[in-house]
Curated annotation (Swiss-Prot):
It comes from Pseudothermotoga lettingae (strain ATCC BAA-301 / DSM 14385 / NBRC 107922 / TMO). It catalyses: RNA(n) + a ribonucleoside 5'-triphosphate = RNA(n+1) + diphosphate. It holds the Pfam family RNA_pol_Rpb2_7. Its EC number is 2.7.7.6. PANTHER family: DNA-DIRECTED RNA POLYMERASE I SUBUNIT 2 (PTHR20856). This is DNA-directed RNA polymerase subunit beta.
Amino acid sequence: MRTVCYGKRERLTFGRIHDAVKVPNLISIQIDSYKDFLENGLIEVLKKFSPITSQPHKGDLKKGEKGFVLEFVSTKVGQPNAPVEECKQKGLTYTVPVYTTVRITDVNTGEMREEEAFLGSIPHMTENGTFIINGAERVIVSQLVRAPGVYFVDEIPKTQVVSPIYVAHFLPVRGAWLELLYYSADNMFYARIDRKRRINLFLLFKALGFTDDLEILDLFPDPIDADDEYTMEKAVGSIILHDVVLDGKKIVERGGVLTKAASQAILESKIATVVRAHPAAQKTLEKMVDTYGEVDSSKAYVEIFRKLKPGEIPRVNTAKAYLTSLYFSTERFELSDVGRYKINKRLTQAYRRYLAQVKGLPEEEVESVEYNPEDPVLTPMDIVLASRYLLDVSKNPEIMDTKDHLGNKRVRTVGELIKLEFERAFARAQRLIQERLTLYASLDKISIQSLINVKTIIAGINQFFATSPLSQFMEQVNPLAELTHKRRLTAVGPGGLKRERARFEVRDVHHSHYGRMCPIETPEGANIGLITSLAVYANIDKFGFLTTPYRKVVNGVVTSEIVYLTADEEEHYNIAPCTIKIDKDGRILDERVPVRFMERLQFVEKNKVQFMDVSTKQIVSVSTSLIPFLEHDDANRALMGSNMQRQAVPLVKPEAPFVATGVEYDAALYSGYVVQAKYSGRVKKVDSRKIVIERMDENGKPVLKNGKPVLDEYRLMKFMRTNQDTTVNQRPIVDIGDIVKAGDVIADGPATDMGELALGKNVLVAFMPWEGYNFEDAILVSEELLEEDTFTSIHIEVYETQARDTRLGPEEITVDIPNVSKEALRNLDENGIVRVGAYVGPQDILVGKVTPKGEGETTPEEKIIRSVFGERGKDVKDTSLRLPHGTDGRVIDVKVFDKDEETDLGAGVNKLVKVYVACRKTLEVGDKLAGRHGNKGVVSKILPKEDMPFLPDGTPVQLVLSPLGVPSRMNVGQILETHLGWLAKLTRNWFATPVFDGAKENEILPWLYEERRAVGLEEGDSDNEPSGKVVLRDGRTGESFAEPIVVGYIYMMKLVHIAKDKIHARSTGPYSLIHQQPLGGKAQFGGQRFGEMEVWALEAHGAAHTLNEMLTIKSDDIKGRNEVYKAILKGKNIPEPGIPESFRVLIKELRGLALDIRVYDENGNEIDIDRV
C-alpha cells in the first residue's frame, strides 16, 4: 500500500498498478474540435465554394463582356461580444465575429482587389466547452454515425432462405448509394443504383469503359486444377482466358469454350492448371448478351438510364451525364477523406490479389503494395475490386463487416457539426453572391460586403444551436453531470438512428467498445445503448474514429511507448490486460498470459503479446470509474450508480468520500468548477470573493514588472444559479502566506472538497430491518443528520417579469397596486421591487406590476380623482410577479434591465426584472438517497437519534438500510465499502481503491478487527474469522438485537428528486380554454386527473352521485359549478348538475365533420344544446 496525493489530500491506495498514462484533459473532445473549426474548418468550407464566378454581364457587346471571379483567401476571428457572465444575466448569446479576406478579379483586365468582409457573429465556446445561447448554457453532444466507405454484408432474400445474397455497399457522405450484389443461388452479379431496381453488373462495367467482353472476364480469372477429373468435367463449357498449348499446338484458344474433348486431352496431358473465367462472371455476361445483345458503352448508358428512369426518353448524352453525375462528379457525390481512407483500407487486400491474379505480378512484390487513389468520388477500379472481393466473401463469410463494429462508426464532434451547418448556410449565400456579381459593370463599383448576405449565414447557424436535437440544455445538477454531458455520444439525431427502429444489436455492448465507449453508463429506458459515454482514456483521431491507448510489448517486455489504436487496427493484435504480473523492468513473469484477440479471450505465450492496457479504468467512463469496488457490482446496478451520481445535489458542507477511487480529483479539475492557480506564487490576500497571488519564478523570487511585483487575481463565483437551480459557490482553500504551484487547486467549487469531487456525505449505516420502515428499499434516518445539516442543500430559482408596451398603453412596475394590503407590500421598495434579503413565501409579491385595462370616455370627476390619486385612480389590472405555490426562500439578488441602458431587451420591452430566490432544503420524508452502487431508497421516517440503534460505545447509527437490498441486486460493493469506510474512520485515513484493482476482503476485515479491538468495539466479531459485524442495541429499549449486524460508513448522496418540489395540492385553479376542464401538472397549478380506471372504481362501489359530481360540477359543467359555488355560499342544497362542456365540444366537432347531430329528451323533444 502506498500514499498518493490527490490535489490537497493524501490517500492510502490499494492499487497495485501504476497507470502508464495520466488521465487526459476530459473536455478536450469539445475544446479541440471547436478550435479546429475556427482555425481550419471555416476556411475549408469557403475554399470549397471558391472560386465563385459571375455570369457574363449582358451589356453592349462592343464594350466587351464583363466577368468577375471571387476567391476566399483566409479567415480571421474577432473578440467575444461580452463577458460570459454578462451574457448569462442579460439573456444574450456569447458570440465572436468572423471575417474573411476576399480576392476579386476582373477576368477581362486581370485587375485584382483584396478586401476584408464580415461573415457574421457565430456562437463561441467558453473555456469550459459550453455555449451561451440566449443566456442559457448549452452543450453540443457528439454524434456516432456510420462511417462512409465500402461494406460487405449478406442479405437473406425474401423468396428463398437457402442461399444468401452477398452485397458490397458503397456508402458516401453525400450522394447516391451503389450496391454490388452477388446472388450465390443464381451464381450471378447485379448492381443496384441509388436503391432502385437491380441491373446486370456488367452493364455497369460496359458503361465504365470496359468495351471488350473478354476484358471483363479477365477481371475474374478462376485457375482450376487440370489433374482433377471431376473439376475438369464440371469446367466443360467454361470460357478459357489463357491459351491452352499442348505439344506446341493450341488446344483451346483464349476466349474459346472448353469442350469435352479438349477437357479429356488436358486431363491426359501434363498441364497443371487451366485459367477459366469465373462461372459467375461467365453467367452474368451470357445473361447480359441474351437480354441486350451486343452492348457497347452508349447502349449500356441508355439501358441503365431506362431502368432507373422508366418514364423518360433515354438519350445517350443525357444517360451518360446522369450516371456520371451520380457517382463520378463531386457536385452530387462525395466520399470525403474518411470514405476514401476506409475504401482504400478495405480494398487493399483485394487490390493485391488483383495484381497477382490479373496482372500476373509476383506474390512478394505485391505484399507491400497499398491501394491509394485519392479521388473524392468512386473510380472504376473501386467497383472492380469490390465485385471481385464479393467472391472471397461468399467463400469466407468471416471477412464480412458487422455494422455495430466501432471501426465502422465515426464521431461527429462539435466542430464538424457546426462546419456542416455553416456549409449549408453558405451554400444559400453563395447563390446570392453569384446573382449580385452579375449586377456590377466594373470592379471599383463592387462592394464585397454587400455581396455577402450575412443574415442567411447567421440564421442557419443560430437555428442549429437553438433547435437541433444535438444542441442540448446543459445538465448542471453537479460538476459530474456537466462533465459527463460534454463527453456524451449519441447514435440518434439528424443523420443517425431512429429511436423506434433501433435494433437490439445496435444497443448492445460490442467487443470493439473496449477502451473507447463505456459498457456501463447509458440511460435506462428508450435510449438504452443509443446514448453512451466516452471511456476515460478514449481519443478521437483526425478521421473521427475512436482510439484508445496501449503500451507496446516487445519480446515479453512492456515498454513505455504508448500507441493509440482504432477498433480496426486493434483486431490484428494480442492485447493483455494491465493486471498481469510484471517485474520492475517490465518483463512479463507468467509464461502464458490471457489476451484479447478480436472478440476472443485466449491464453498465449508471453512473447506473442504485442500490447498491454494502460490502466484498469480504461474500459469505463468517468462516472463509472468513481464507483469503488465496481468489480463486485452487477452491471445493471453499476449503471444505476453511474447515472445517479449525476443527479446528486451539491450540499451545503461538501465532504469527500472516505473510500474513493482516485478519479475524484481529475473529475473535479476538468469540470471547470475548481479554481486553479495559473502561475506559481505566494498567497497575498484571501477573502470569500477573491484570491490574490504574488507571482514567483522557479527560484522562489517575486516576478517584477516596472519594478512592482506581479499580482494575479482570481475572482470566485458566489451563489450563482445553475440550469437545474442548484447552487455554484466557490470557497478558498488556501491561506495568506501559502506557496502555490501553477496548476494547484486554490478554491473549491460546488460538490468539491479539497479539490476532490464530493457529491455526498459519509454516514454511519447499519444493514438491518427496523419495524418495517425499510420495506422496499426505504431508508430510516436519524434526526442527527438534520441537526448537523448533513444533507441540506441550497437551490436558487429565478423569477422574471417584463414591463411591455400594450395596445392600451405601457405596463408599469410600481408599488401602487390596486386592492392589495400594506402587509403584502411590506417587502417592496419604492419602485415596487422586492428588497434583497427579504424572506418570501407562497403568493408573496416579488415585483409589483400593473397593466392598463380597456376604458371608455373619462368624466371630469374621474379626471379629478386621477390627478389626486395618480395611478390608483386609473383602471388598471394587477399583473404582479408572485412567488408560486409550494415555494419559499430568501431573495439573494435582483437584476433590473432598463430599455434606456440596454439595447437588446427585445421589441416592445421597456424593463426586465429578474429576482433570484434561494431556498434551503433539508432532508425530508420522501427525499431520495442513493449510494454509488445503485443502492437507492426513499426516506421513510426521521427518528430521534436517541431511538436509533447504537454501537457498544453508545454511538447511534445515522441510517438504517434494508439488508434485502443486497443479495438479489448483487451489488456487494456497498458491503465492502461499508467495512472499508469504518476502517477509514477508525484509522483517520482516506483510502483509494481503484476500479478492477481495489482492496480485497482479506486486506480489510483483519485490519478492521484490529482497529475495533483497540477502541473496544470488537463485540460481535471474532479474531479467527472476522466478519465486520457488531452487536447493536435498540435505542428505545437498550436491549441488544439478536444477531450481530454489518455497520460502517457508506458514501450517500441526496438526489435531485426532492419531495418538496413534487408535492402539490389544488383548491381552485385555472381551466383549459376549450374543454373547460382543470389543467394538469404542478407547473400549471393543475388538478389530479380522474381517469378511466378511477371511474371504474367508483362504478364498482355504486357511488353514482359522487361519480356524477366528479364528471360534471367538479370538472367541466360551467353553469353547474358556478351554481354550486353560489349554493355553498348561501348554505342552500346543491343543485342538479348540467351538461359537461366536453359533450358540447364533441357535438361541435362532429358538426365540423358535416354530420347533422341533434339531441332529444326522453319524450322525443329536441333540445337546443347551446342554451341548456
